[in-house]
Amino acid sequence: MIKILFICHGNICRSPMAEFVMKDLVQKANLQDKIYIESAATSTEELGNGMHRGTVTKLRQENIPFTNHRARQITAQDYNNFDYLIGMDQENLYYMEKRWPNDTDHKISLLLEFANLFRDIADPWYTGNFDKTYADIQLGCQALLEKIKERI
């Protein structure tokens, strides 16, 4: 089982969007018994809160199924429990590298790196642009799934 943890600042916008987009792609590829997906936050600001209404609205518009979600923070154990620790922007990466300073297994990356794009996925909490965030996440998740398919 390959395990993926998507990570953003609050775990209410980008990382849960990536979690449910990836789950949808995995389901459509009939790989749900081979790939496990979760999401988490670098901060404690939104712990226990549900997804942002903009994220919920965008997932519904795109017919991406989702379940009840409550924000959680990354833990030290996540490094051992997941194969991929995927951030959305440089700030996420900074806090991930602080939490797991010895990434000897090279698990830490940014989502758009899988699509050979070396830029951040903008936080719609600040931009209000959930469409752009969704497009970037969809692009990154599709590329990540293709990479994972090579391993299984």
Name what the model sees in each region.
Residues 84, 90-152:
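Phosphate-binding/catalytic loops
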Residues 1-81, 146-152:
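Conserved active-site segments centered on acidic
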